[in-house]
Amino acid sequence: MSSQSYRERTLVSVIGDDDTVTGMLLAGTGQVNENGDKNFFIITQKTTDEQIAEAFDDYTTKRKDIAIVLINQFAAERIRDRIENHVQAFPAVLEIPSKDDPYDPEKDSILRRVRKIIGE
């Protein structure tokens, strides 16, 4: 990937519950492009794993303007295979806690990769 393509990645996307997404939108991360594509996806009780996976795939493979994907850890657990298979540097995928689900470092794929590299 050229350095020019890295420069085009300027957005943070969010996949999470309504409280997490609302907080990130209030912080100024929300964006809707000229095609009506949003850089955020709200998970409700009716959201399927396939819908979460579709949003993740959109942000990590189709969109070339996303630099970081923030995903609630409970949502990452629902699509763990896709999280584990994402190995590109950009967009970076970071698992974050939600209001109702505390962060568990043992489930974090990035932390597991780091521990494997350093031999823990």
UniProtKB/Swiss-Prot annotation:
Give the UniProt subcellular location, in the record's own words: Vacuole membrane
State the gene name recorded for this protein. vma7
Q: Report quaternary structure and partners.
A: V-ATPase is a heteromultimeric enzyme composed of a peripheral catalytic V1 complex (components A to H) attached to an integral membrane V0 proton pore complex (components: a, c, c', c'', d, e, f and VOA1).
Asked if the keyword Transport belongs to this entry, the reply reads yes
Q: What is its main location?
A: membrane
Described by its record, this protein's role is as follows: Subunit of the V1 complex of vacuolar(H+)-ATPase (V-ATPase), a multisubunit enzyme composed of a peripheral complex (V1) that hydrolyzes ATP and a membrane integral complex (V0) that translocates protons. V-ATPase is responsible for acidifying and maintaining the pH of intracellular compartments.
Q: Name one Pfam family in it.
A: ATP-synt_F
Any one GO BP annotation for this protein: proton transmembrane transport
What cellular component terms from Gene Ontology apply here? cytosol; fungal-type vacuole membrane; membrane; nucleus; vacuolar proton-transporting V-type ATPase, V1 domain
This protein is called: V-type proton ATPase subunit F
Q: Which family does it belong to?
A: Belongs to the V-ATPase F subunit family.
Alphabetic keyword roster = Hydrogen ion transport, Ion transport, Membrane, Transport, Vacuole
Q: Which terms in the Gene Ontology molecular function aspect does this entry carry?
A: ATP hydrolysis activity; proton-transporting ATPase activity, rotational mechanism
Keyword Phosphoprotein tagged: no
Membrane topology, record value: Peripheral membrane protein
